[in-house]
UniProtKB/Swiss-Prot annotation:
Pfam families: Bacteriocin_II. Belongs to the bacteriocin class IIA/YGNGV family. The lineage of its organism: Bacteria, Bacillati, Bacillota, Bacilli, Lactobacillales. Disulfide bonds join 9-14. This is Bacteriocin leucocin-C. Gene3D superfamilies: 1.20.5.130. It is found in: Secreted. Transmembrane segments: none annotated. It comes from Leuconostoc mesenteroides. Inhibits a wide spectrum of lactic acid bacteria. GO terms for biological process: defense response to bacterium; killing of cells of another organism. Keywords: Antibiotic, Antimicrobial, Bacteriocin, Disulfide bond, Secreted. GO terms for cellular component: extracellular region.
Length: 43
């Protein structure tokens, strides 16, 4: 499964494209904070 934030998972585990993920993690953290968890990873 590809979570669209630089993280993709298989049956063996998950891996992260850190260059892509850090931008999204930062954006999602801010948006999750502002919306009480209704944005970013939880949409």
């Amino acid at each position: 499964k590809n979570y669209g934030n630089g993280v993709h998972c298989t049956k063996k585990g998950c891996s992260v494209d850190w260059g892509y993920a850090w931008t999204n993690i930062a954006n999602n953290s801010v948006m999750n904070g502002l919306t009480g968890g209704n944005a970013g990873w939880h949409n």
